Amino acid sequence: TTSVFYNELGKAERICYPNGSSTVYEYEKGGRLKSVRYPDGAGEHYGYDAKGNLTERTTTAGENYRYNYDSLDRMISVQNPAGGISYFTYDALGRVIKAENESGNQTCYEYTPNGNLAKVTDAMGNETFYQYDAMGHLTQSSCTGAEGEEPQNTVYTWDKEGHVTAVTDPLGDVECYTYDPAGRMKAKIDKDGYETSFHYGKDGQVEEIRYADGRTVSLTYNAIRQLEEVRDWLGTTKIAMDEAGHIASVTDPYGKTVGYEWGSMGERTAICYPHGR
């Protein structure tokens, strides 16, 4: 059994494993994670500024990362263990418009008047453009490479209800989607013409998934709409719930069961594996 112990704030402070080892979490008074100590003795450490922004992180290998912020709490630089610094620049609306890595390579971002991403230019000069319809749905992304190359376009088609009905990739292959009157996905047809269909019960939950090769997955729910059984070509997986609505156990098609225990605040306190492992 693996047991989890929590502090007064509901945060995990110790995980105890069946072999007697443990992972220990330490927090600051405000609840921010201060350190983690793993079973092998290695640990991670975290530091924060007065506003709660992460300013320092030390990895299990002893590598140190430092983070700096502007007056609006936006991250403006990251220093890696080797001393290299990455920088971030923002526009007046708080959107990243330029990211520069420790080698000086820059990626630039442009936006539409509506705030959607319009263009990305990477350090090699490759540009990706994004187009949208009047509703703000992405309709096309176009990636340009070396001069003279054809742009690589991905096209998205939408219905009037706002559902994606087709995606056409740069090779011209199309994946299509259909929906029922309730807006639920009814079928997906991949580029090779293979169809996966979804079938719903009266309460709107998926009851069966049918694949092009004839295989099916059946799903059964209890009276309060919780999934309790999945039947597929491998067999039946059963899910038992406790009175509070938490998963109490999962039994796979081979009869192996994993059990879960929960605390009064809804936190998971233990996992019981088959054969006690």
Regions found by a protein language model. Name each.
Residues 1-17, 21-38, 42-59, 63-80, ...:
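Beta-strand elements of repeat-based all-beta scaffolds
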